[in-house]
Amino acid sequence: QAEPVSVAITVEMNGKDLGQRVRTFSVRSINECLLGYVANGTKFHDTSIFFAAYVNEENPMIDQLLREALNTRIVNRFLGYQSKAKGAVDKQVYALWNILQKRKFRYSSVSNTSLSSNVVFSQRVRTFDDALESSQINCVDGSVLFASLLRAINIDPILVRTPGHMFVGYYTDNSHTNKNFLETTMIGDVDLDDFFPDEQLDSTMVGKSQNEMSLLTFEKSKQYANKKYKENEEGIHSGKLNYMFLEISK
């Protein structure tokens, strides 16, 4: 909830009181990310770079999550870009995906905020702690959560925004030559047929173990997000409104 705060300013010059003015401002929740604002009635200033503020690799909960990921034995340690083995980075990323799936996240489309107006635009974003405690994420929550974990293991993440959607990417090498993308809403309990209607994937899930299903959704998440990136690549790198390619390492 927004709370009003009054600010009083008193001016004096050469010992003479020049008067006082009082302005009332609204203090908003840290969960409200400012997307942009309109100045002078016409010019829009994009502030979506503020999404980066929700990427928090220093969160105390991360150590516990990384320990859970190591306990899966998918990887023995997190080396970031140090390993030269083929697929080493993707394997580390999958270990993170796997443990988040075990926490049974659910997709939640809640993104409304009391701040948005025809002058100031914002979106509600769950903090790292909020997302873990509620086990609910939307596309933005999932992207900044996953980016936080990637940063914690020294893999450089990317936040990608298209109109009405966000997904996360990561560089697969230290030189930033190659990259992959993930559709984080697929971490939750989803119907794969919604993403791949022509493949009837849900029927192939019958009888598979939890880890087999987790790996399948991880690979399909990459496939889906990489396709979306290619379809929107021109806009993503154009600097146009509602598009964003934000490298968190920079």
What are these regions (language model features)?
Residues Q1-K250:
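A structural boundary/capping signal
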